[in-house]
Amino acid sequence: NELQDQDFINRFTQGMDAGTMPDWAQNSANGGENFKDYILGTYDGTPKTPEWAADICGVSAEDIKKLAHMYATTKPAALKASWAPGRNAYGEQYSRMGAALQAMTGNIGILGGCAEGVGKAWHAEAVAYPYDQYANIWFASIKSDRWAHIVLNYPNVTREEAGLWPRDDQFDGVVPNIKGLFWQGSDWFNQLTNINKELEAVKKLELNVCLDSTITPTGSFAADVLLPVSTHFERHDVALPWYKGHYYIHRPKVIEPLGESKSDFQIFTELAWRIGGEVFGKAYNPRADRSYFDNADAVDEAYLSAWWHDKVMHHQGVTMSWEEFKKRGVYKFKLDKPHVAFRAQVEEGQPFQTPSGKIEILCTELAQISDWKRTKYGYHIPSIPKWIEPWESLNSPKTSKHPFHLISPHPRWRTHSIFNNCSWLRETYEQEATINAADAKRLGI
Protein backbone atom coordinates (compact mmCIF):
# COMPACT_ATOMS: atom_id res chain seq x y z
CA ASN A 1 0.00 0.00 0.00
CA GLU A 2 3.05 2.26 -0.28
CA LEU A 3 2.82 3.19 3.41
CA GLN A 4 6.57 2.83 3.89
CA ASP A 5 8.87 5.83 4.26
CA GLN A 6 10.76 5.25 1.03
CA ASP A 7 13.02 8.27 1.43
CA PHE A 8 14.19 7.02 4.84
CA ILE A 9 14.69 3.53 3.40
CA ASN A 10 16.78 4.83 0.51
CA ARG A 11 18.97 7.04 2.68
CA PHE A 12 19.55 4.96 5.77
CA THR A 13 19.01 1.23 5.21
CA GLN A 14 20.86 -1.66 3.62
CA GLY A 15 18.89 -4.56 2.20
CA MET A 16 15.35 -3.31 2.82
CA ASP A 17 14.55 -3.63 -0.89
CA ALA A 18 16.35 -4.23 -4.18
CA GLY A 19 17.32 -0.57 -4.44
CA THR A 20 19.23 -0.63 -1.14
CA MET A 21 21.28 -3.75 -1.78
CA PRO A 22 25.09 -3.32 -1.64
CA ASP A 23 27.20 -4.16 -4.69
CA TRP A 24 28.88 -7.09 -2.96
CA ALA A 25 25.53 -8.84 -2.49
CA GLN A 26 25.41 -9.82 -6.18
CA ASN A 27 28.20 -12.34 -5.66
CA SER A 28 27.32 -13.38 -2.11
CA ALA A 29 26.14 -16.89 -1.35
CA ASN A 30 24.37 -15.75 1.81
CA GLY A 31 23.57 -12.09 1.17
CA GLY A 32 21.62 -11.99 -2.08
CA GLU A 33 18.11 -11.58 -0.65
CA ASN A 34 16.39 -8.33 0.29
CA PHE A 35 13.67 -7.95 2.89
CA LYS A 36 10.87 -6.66 0.64
CA ASP A 37 11.11 -9.54 -1.82
CA TYR A 38 11.20 -12.01 1.07
CA ILE A 39 7.96 -10.53 2.45
CA LEU A 40 6.35 -10.64 -1.01
CA GLY A 41 7.29 -14.31 -1.40
CA THR A 42 9.59 -13.77 -4.37
CA TYR A 43 12.15 -16.28 -3.12
CA ASP A 44 10.06 -19.05 -1.58
CA GLY A 45 6.68 -18.59 -3.26
CA THR A 46 4.97 -17.79 0.06
CA PRO A 47 3.81 -14.17 0.43
CA LYS A 48 3.91 -13.17 4.10
CA THR A 49 0.33 -11.86 4.11
CA PRO A 50 -1.85 -11.08 7.14
CA GLU A 51 -3.69 -14.34 6.43
CA TRP A 52 -0.39 -16.23 6.46
CA ALA A 53 0.54 -14.62 9.78
CA ALA A 54 -2.91 -15.26 11.28
CA ASP A 55 -2.50 -19.02 10.83
CA ILE A 56 0.74 -18.86 12.81
CA CYS A 57 -0.04 -16.47 15.65
CA GLY A 58 -3.79 -16.82 16.15
CA VAL A 59 -4.51 -13.10 15.73
CA SER A 60 -7.09 -12.46 13.02
CA ALA A 61 -5.92 -11.15 9.67
CA GLU A 62 -8.31 -8.22 10.06
CA ASP A 63 -6.72 -7.19 13.37
CA ILE A 64 -3.24 -7.53 11.88
CA LYS A 65 -4.23 -5.21 9.01
CA LYS A 66 -5.71 -2.64 11.40
CA LEU A 67 -2.62 -2.61 13.59
CA ALA A 68 -0.27 -2.40 10.60
CA HIS A 69 -2.21 0.53 9.12
CA MET A 70 -2.36 2.30 12.48
CA TYR A 71 1.38 1.96 13.01
CA ALA A 72 2.33 2.97 9.46
CA THR A 73 0.12 6.06 9.41
CA THR A 74 0.80 7.37 12.93
CA LYS A 75 3.62 9.90 12.84
CA PRO A 76 5.67 9.58 14.93
CA ALA A 77 5.08 6.12 16.37
CA ALA A 78 7.07 4.29 19.04
CA LEU A 79 7.20 0.53 18.56
CA LYS A 80 8.46 -0.79 21.89
CA ALA A 81 9.71 -4.27 21.09
CA SER A 82 10.22 -5.76 24.54
CA TRP A 83 12.83 -8.42 25.19
CA ALA A 84 10.71 -11.33 26.41
CA PRO A 85 9.62 -12.73 23.00
CA GLY A 86 13.24 -12.75 21.95
CA ARG A 87 14.02 -15.25 24.71
CA ASN A 88 12.68 -18.03 22.56
CA ALA A 89 13.90 -20.31 19.80
CA TYR A 90 15.26 -18.07 17.00
CA GLY A 91 14.31 -15.08 19.12
CA GLU A 92 16.81 -12.84 17.36
CA GLN A 93 14.46 -12.79 14.37
CA TYR A 94 11.79 -11.09 16.47
CA SER A 95 14.22 -8.34 17.50
CA ARG A 96 15.42 -7.85 13.93
CA MET A 97 11.85 -7.67 12.63
CA GLY A 98 11.10 -4.92 15.14
CA ALA A 99 14.05 -2.89 13.90
CA ALA A 100 12.98 -3.47 10.29
CA LEU A 101 9.49 -2.12 11.00
CA GLN A 102 10.91 0.93 12.75
CA ALA A 103 13.20 1.65 9.82
CA MET A 104 10.52 0.90 7.23
CA THR A 105 8.26 3.58 8.70
CA GLY A 106 11.02 6.14 9.33
CA ASN A 107 10.60 6.05 13.10
CA ILE A 108 14.29 5.91 13.98
CA GLY A 109 16.21 9.03 14.91
CA ILE A 110 13.13 11.18 15.51
CA LEU A 111 11.47 12.43 18.67
CA GLY A 112 8.55 10.15 19.47
CA GLY A 113 9.92 7.23 17.49
CA CYS A 114 11.90 4.33 18.87
CA ALA A 115 15.00 2.36 18.02
CA GLU A 116 14.66 -1.37 18.70
CA GLY A 117 15.01 -2.65 22.27
CA VAL A 118 16.04 -0.02 24.82
CA GLY A 119 16.57 2.43 22.01
CA LYS A 120 20.23 3.37 22.47
CA ALA A 121 19.31 5.33 25.55
CA TRP A 122 21.57 7.96 27.06
CA HIS A 123 23.98 6.12 29.30
CA ALA A 124 26.04 6.64 32.40
CA GLU A 125 29.55 5.46 33.21
CA ALA A 126 28.85 2.03 34.64
CA VAL A 127 32.11 0.53 35.88
CA ALA A 128 33.70 1.56 39.16
CA TYR A 129 35.74 -1.54 39.97
CA PRO A 130 38.86 -2.76 38.14
CA TYR A 131 38.96 -4.73 34.93
CA ASP A 132 42.59 -5.79 34.73
CA GLN A 133 44.43 -8.63 33.06
CA TYR A 134 43.63 -11.03 35.90
CA ALA A 135 39.96 -10.12 36.25
CA ASN A 136 39.32 -10.98 32.61
CA ILE A 137 41.09 -14.32 32.19
CA TRP A 138 38.78 -16.80 30.51
CA PHE A 139 39.24 -20.24 29.03
CA ALA A 140 36.18 -20.42 26.82
CA SER A 141 32.95 -18.51 26.42
CA ILE A 142 29.85 -20.48 25.54
CA LYS A 143 26.18 -19.74 25.10
CA SER A 144 24.63 -19.64 28.56
CA ASP A 145 21.83 -22.03 27.62
CA ARG A 146 24.25 -24.70 26.31
CA TRP A 147 26.08 -25.61 29.51
CA ALA A 148 23.74 -28.46 30.40
CA HIS A 149 24.09 -30.00 26.94
CA ILE A 150 27.88 -29.88 27.30
CA VAL A 151 27.83 -31.48 30.75
CA LEU A 152 25.49 -34.28 29.69
CA ASN A 153 27.23 -35.08 26.40
CA TYR A 154 30.93 -34.27 26.89
CA PRO A 155 33.23 -35.12 25.11
CA ASN A 156 30.85 -35.75 22.22
CA VAL A 157 30.00 -32.08 21.76
CA THR A 158 30.84 -29.97 18.72
CA ARG A 159 31.85 -26.34 18.95
CA GLU A 160 28.65 -25.20 17.26
CA GLU A 161 26.56 -27.15 19.77
CA ALA A 162 28.38 -25.33 22.55
CA GLY A 163 28.02 -21.93 20.91
CA LEU A 164 31.77 -21.59 21.43
CA TRP A 165 33.20 -18.15 20.80
CA PRO A 166 36.20 -18.15 18.43
CA ARG A 167 39.69 -17.51 19.80
CA ASP A 168 43.07 -16.71 18.29
CA ASP A 169 45.13 -19.22 20.25
CA GLN A 170 45.53 -22.96 20.84
CA PHE A 171 42.23 -23.11 22.71
CA ASP A 172 40.14 -22.21 19.68
CA GLY A 173 37.49 -24.88 19.22
CA VAL A 174 38.26 -26.61 22.53
CA VAL A 175 34.94 -27.39 24.22
CA PRO A 176 35.34 -27.06 28.01
CA ASN A 177 34.93 -30.07 30.25
CA ILE A 178 32.71 -28.42 32.84
CA LYS A 179 33.32 -29.80 36.34
CA GLY A 180 31.60 -27.14 38.41
CA LEU A 181 29.62 -23.93 38.26
CA PHE A 182 29.84 -20.58 39.99
CA TRP A 183 26.33 -19.14 40.00
CA GLN A 184 26.84 -15.47 40.77
CA GLY A 185 23.62 -13.52 41.34
CA SER A 186 21.79 -15.49 38.68
CA ASP A 187 18.91 -17.89 39.20
CA TRP A 188 19.43 -20.08 36.15
CA PHE A 189 16.71 -22.53 37.11
CA ASN A 190 14.31 -19.66 36.69
CA GLN A 191 15.86 -17.72 33.83
CA LEU A 192 17.15 -20.19 31.26
CA THR A 193 15.43 -22.62 28.95
CA ASN A 194 15.02 -26.40 29.21
CA ILE A 195 15.13 -26.54 32.99
CA ASN A 196 14.63 -30.32 33.11
CA LYS A 197 17.91 -30.79 31.24
CA GLU A 198 19.62 -28.40 33.67
CA LEU A 199 18.33 -30.31 36.68
CA GLU A 200 19.78 -33.49 35.21
CA ALA A 201 23.11 -31.87 34.36
CA VAL A 202 23.69 -30.22 37.73
CA LYS A 203 23.70 -33.63 39.43
CA LYS A 204 26.79 -34.60 37.40
CA LEU A 205 28.89 -31.63 38.49
CA GLU A 206 31.56 -31.99 41.16
CA LEU A 207 31.04 -28.54 42.67
CA ASN A 208 28.26 -25.95 42.63
CA VAL A 209 28.79 -22.60 44.32
CA CYS A 210 26.03 -19.99 44.53
CA LEU A 211 26.54 -16.33 45.43
CA ASP A 212 23.32 -14.44 46.07
CA SER A 213 21.53 -12.19 48.51
CA THR A 214 18.41 -14.37 48.52
CA ILE A 215 17.96 -18.12 48.51
CA THR A 216 16.79 -18.78 44.97
CA PRO A 217 15.60 -22.11 43.54
CA THR A 218 19.08 -22.52 42.05
CA GLY A 219 20.72 -21.91 45.41
CA SER A 220 18.41 -24.17 47.39
CA PHE A 221 18.51 -27.05 44.91
CA ALA A 222 21.95 -26.92 43.36
CA ALA A 223 24.39 -25.31 45.78
CA ASP A 224 27.09 -27.33 47.51
CA VAL A 225 28.37 -24.01 48.86
CA LEU A 226 26.04 -21.04 49.35
CA LEU A 227 27.84 -17.73 49.87
CA PRO A 228 25.57 -14.95 51.17
CA VAL A 229 26.03 -11.65 49.33
CA SER A 230 25.27 -8.39 51.08
CA THR A 231 22.52 -6.19 49.67
CA HIS A 232 22.93 -2.59 48.57
CA PHE A 233 21.73 -1.53 52.02
CA GLU A 234 24.84 -3.12 53.52
CA ARG A 235 27.54 -1.55 51.37
CA HIS A 236 28.50 1.79 49.93
CA ASP A 237 27.67 2.13 46.23
CA VAL A 238 26.16 4.21 43.44
CA ALA A 239 22.90 3.28 41.76
CA LEU A 240 22.70 3.51 37.99
CA PRO A 241 19.39 3.51 36.14
CA TRP A 242 18.26 0.39 34.37
CA TYR A 243 19.02 -0.04 31.55
CA LYS A 244 20.36 3.37 30.72
CA GLY A 245 19.50 6.83 31.96
CA HIS A 246 20.71 10.31 32.81
CA TYR A 247 21.15 10.27 36.58
CA TYR A 248 23.14 8.77 39.44
CA ILE A 249 21.87 8.01 42.94
CA HIS A 250 24.24 7.75 45.89
CA ARG A 251 23.59 4.69 48.02
CA PRO A 252 25.11 5.06 51.47
CA LYS A 253 25.67 2.06 53.65
CA VAL A 254 22.63 1.86 55.94
CA ILE A 255 23.44 -1.15 58.12
CA GLU A 256 26.34 -3.52 58.63
CA PRO A 257 26.17 -6.74 56.59
CA LEU A 258 23.89 -9.27 58.23
CA GLY A 259 25.30 -12.58 59.38
CA GLU A 260 28.29 -13.70 57.34
CA SER A 261 27.30 -11.85 54.16
CA LYS A 262 29.97 -10.04 52.13
CA SER A 263 29.89 -8.08 48.90
CA ASP A 264 30.61 -9.89 45.64
CA PHE A 265 33.89 -8.04 45.30
CA GLN A 266 34.96 -8.97 48.83
CA ILE A 267 34.26 -12.63 48.09
CA PHE A 268 36.13 -12.68 44.78
CA THR A 269 39.06 -10.76 46.24
CA GLU A 270 39.37 -13.22 49.11
CA LEU A 271 39.22 -16.14 46.68
CA ALA A 272 41.97 -14.52 44.61
CA TRP A 273 44.18 -14.26 47.71
CA ARG A 274 43.51 -17.85 48.71
CA ILE A 275 44.10 -19.23 45.22
CA GLY A 276 47.16 -17.21 44.23
CA GLY A 277 48.47 -15.52 47.34
CA GLU A 278 49.47 -11.89 47.48
CA VAL A 279 50.60 -11.69 43.84
CA PHE A 280 47.28 -12.79 42.41
CA GLY A 281 45.23 -11.15 45.15
CA LYS A 282 46.82 -7.73 44.70
CA ALA A 283 46.68 -8.04 40.93
CA TYR A 284 42.97 -8.80 41.04
CA ASN A 285 42.18 -6.00 43.50
CA PRO A 286 45.09 -3.54 43.54
CA ARG A 287 43.63 -1.32 46.25
CA ALA A 288 43.00 -4.07 48.80
CA ASP A 289 44.97 -6.20 51.19
CA ARG A 290 43.70 -9.13 53.24
CA SER A 291 41.83 -6.83 55.61
CA TYR A 292 39.43 -5.98 52.78
CA PHE A 293 37.49 -9.17 53.45
CA ASP A 294 36.57 -7.91 56.91
CA ASN A 295 36.60 -4.15 56.33
CA ALA A 296 35.60 -3.05 52.86
CA ASP A 297 34.43 0.50 53.46
CA ALA A 298 37.71 2.36 52.88
CA VAL A 299 38.58 0.42 49.72
CA ASP A 300 35.08 0.79 48.28
CA GLU A 301 35.22 4.53 48.98
CA ALA A 302 38.57 4.74 47.17
CA TYR A 303 37.23 2.97 44.08
CA LEU A 304 34.03 4.99 43.94
CA SER A 305 35.80 8.30 44.48
CA ALA A 306 38.38 7.57 41.78
CA TRP A 307 35.67 6.40 39.39
CA TRP A 308 33.67 9.56 39.94
CA HIS A 309 36.61 11.92 39.47
CA ASP A 310 38.43 10.05 36.69
CA LYS A 311 35.50 8.76 34.66
CA VAL A 312 32.26 10.55 35.45
CA MET A 313 33.70 14.05 35.82
CA HIS A 314 36.31 13.61 33.10
CA HIS A 315 34.25 11.83 30.44
CA GLN A 316 30.84 13.36 30.99
CA GLY A 317 31.61 16.93 31.98
CA VAL A 318 30.20 16.61 35.49
CA THR A 319 31.33 19.48 37.73
CA MET A 320 29.86 18.23 41.01
CA SER A 321 32.56 16.71 43.21
CA TRP A 322 32.28 13.28 44.78
CA GLU A 323 31.93 14.84 48.20
CA GLU A 324 29.11 17.11 47.05
CA PHE A 325 27.39 14.20 45.29
CA LYS A 326 27.39 12.22 48.52
CA LYS A 327 25.81 15.13 50.37
CA ARG A 328 23.10 15.71 47.79
CA GLY A 329 22.41 12.04 47.13
CA VAL A 330 21.55 12.42 43.46
CA TYR A 331 22.99 13.87 40.27
CA LYS A 332 20.81 14.43 37.24
CA PHE A 333 22.25 15.44 33.90
CA LYS A 334 20.70 18.49 32.31
CA LEU A 335 20.12 17.83 28.62
CA ASP A 336 19.82 20.78 26.25
CA LYS A 337 17.18 18.88 24.31
CA PRO A 338 15.50 15.47 24.64
CA HIS A 339 17.83 12.59 23.96
CA VAL A 340 16.88 10.83 20.73
CA ALA A 341 18.69 7.67 19.71
CA PHE A 342 20.47 8.05 16.35
CA ARG A 343 19.46 11.69 15.96
CA ALA A 344 22.98 12.51 14.77
CA GLN A 345 22.82 9.80 12.10
CA VAL A 346 19.49 10.95 10.72
CA GLU A 347 19.85 14.72 11.09
CA GLU A 348 23.59 15.19 10.61
CA GLY A 349 24.53 12.26 8.40
CA GLN A 350 26.84 10.52 10.85
CA PRO A 351 27.27 6.83 9.96
CA PHE A 352 25.51 4.15 11.99
CA GLN A 353 27.86 1.88 13.93
CA THR A 354 27.65 -0.95 11.41
CA PRO A 355 30.07 -2.13 8.71
CA SER A 356 28.00 -0.34 6.05
CA GLY A 357 27.29 2.75 8.14
CA LYS A 358 23.58 2.10 7.63
CA ILE A 359 20.73 0.31 9.39
CA GLU A 360 21.49 -3.22 8.27
CA ILE A 361 18.33 -5.09 7.41
CA LEU A 362 20.77 -7.18 5.39
CA CYS A 363 23.49 -7.92 7.96
CA THR A 364 26.98 -7.63 6.49
CA GLU A 365 28.56 -9.83 9.15
CA LEU A 366 26.05 -12.67 8.79
CA ALA A 367 26.15 -12.52 4.99
CA GLN A 368 29.91 -12.99 4.93
CA ILE A 369 30.07 -16.02 7.23
CA SER A 370 31.15 -19.13 5.35
CA ASP A 371 31.81 -21.48 8.27
CA TRP A 372 29.10 -21.27 10.93
CA LYS A 373 31.01 -23.70 13.11
CA ARG A 374 33.61 -21.02 13.78
CA THR A 375 31.19 -18.41 15.09
CA LYS A 376 29.80 -17.44 18.47
CA TYR A 377 26.28 -18.16 17.22
CA GLY A 378 26.47 -21.93 16.92
CA TYR A 379 23.91 -22.20 14.13
CA HIS A 380 22.95 -20.54 10.86
CA ILE A 381 21.19 -17.18 11.09
CA PRO A 382 19.69 -15.76 7.89
CA SER A 383 21.22 -12.53 6.64
CA ILE A 384 17.84 -10.78 6.62
CA PRO A 385 15.06 -11.14 9.21
CA LYS A 386 12.91 -14.20 8.51
CA TRP A 387 10.19 -16.19 10.20
CA ILE A 388 11.59 -19.48 11.50
CA GLU A 389 9.21 -21.85 13.23
CA PRO A 390 10.32 -22.56 16.83
CA TRP A 391 10.82 -26.21 17.63
CA GLU A 392 8.09 -26.02 20.27
CA SER A 393 5.07 -23.97 19.24
CA LEU A 394 1.33 -24.36 18.78
CA ASN A 395 2.05 -25.53 15.24
CA SER A 396 4.10 -28.47 16.51
CA PRO A 397 2.82 -32.05 16.16
CA LYS A 398 3.19 -32.25 19.96
CA THR A 399 0.04 -30.15 20.35
CA SER A 400 -2.11 -33.23 19.75
CA LYS A 401 -1.00 -34.39 23.19
CA HIS A 402 -0.02 -31.03 24.72
CA PRO A 403 -2.48 -28.46 23.34
CA PHE A 404 -1.47 -25.48 25.47
CA HIS A 405 1.51 -23.16 25.22
CA LEU A 406 2.87 -22.08 28.61
CA ILE A 407 4.21 -18.54 28.91
CA SER A 408 5.82 -17.43 32.16
CA PRO A 409 5.87 -13.63 32.39
CA HIS A 410 7.11 -11.67 35.39
CA PRO A 411 4.57 -11.96 38.21
CA ARG A 412 3.60 -8.56 39.56
CA TRP A 413 4.36 -9.75 43.08
CA ARG A 414 8.09 -10.20 42.75
CA THR A 415 11.19 -9.44 40.68
CA HIS A 416 12.01 -12.39 38.45
CA SER A 417 12.30 -15.19 41.02
CA ILE A 418 13.62 -13.32 44.06
CA PHE A 419 11.52 -12.54 47.12
CA ASN A 420 9.23 -15.48 46.39
CA ASN A 421 10.29 -16.90 49.76
CA CYS A 422 9.42 -13.71 51.66
CA SER A 423 6.74 -14.72 54.17
CA TRP A 424 5.06 -11.29 54.17
CA LEU A 425 4.59 -11.39 50.42
CA ARG A 426 3.39 -14.99 50.50
CA GLU A 427 0.63 -13.91 52.89
CA THR A 428 -0.66 -11.33 50.40
CA TYR A 429 -0.96 -13.48 47.29
CA GLU A 430 -0.78 -16.94 45.84
CA GLN A 431 1.00 -17.57 42.56
CA GLU A 432 -1.65 -18.09 39.91
CA ALA A 433 -1.90 -19.60 36.47
CA THR A 434 -4.20 -17.92 33.96
CA ILE A 435 -5.85 -19.38 30.90
CA ASN A 436 -7.40 -17.78 27.85
CA ALA A 437 -11.08 -17.06 28.49
CA ALA A 438 -12.17 -18.87 25.33
CA ASP A 439 -10.29 -22.02 26.32
CA ALA A 440 -11.63 -21.81 29.86
CA LYS A 441 -15.21 -21.57 28.61
CA ARG A 442 -14.72 -24.51 26.25
CA LEU A 443 -13.32 -26.63 29.08
CA GLY A 444 -15.88 -25.55 31.64
CA ILE A 445 -13.34 -23.82 33.87
Question: Can you say where each PLM-predicted feature lies in the sequence?
Answer:
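Structural signal for hydrophobic packing residues in well-ordered secondary-structure cores
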Residues: 1-3, 43, 61, 68-75, ...
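Long, well-ordered, tryptophan-enriched scaffold segments
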Residues: 1-74
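Flexible, glycine/charged-enriched surface loops at secondary-structure junctions
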Residues: 4-10, 78, 109-116, 280-287
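Flexible glycine/proline-enriched surface loops and loop-helix/loop-strand junctions
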Residues: 31-35, 47-52, 80-85, 247-256
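Conserved short loop/turn motifs at secondary-structure junctions
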Residues: 53-56, 82-90, 120-123, 186-189
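Extended redox/cofactor-interaction regions of prokaryotic respiratory oxidoreductases
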Residues: 100-221, 231-238, 326-443
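Glycine/threonine-rich phosphate-binding loop and adjacent beta-strand/alpha-helix elements that clamp
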Residues: 233-257, 267-268, 272-274
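Long, C-terminal catalytic modules of enzymes
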Residues: 255-329
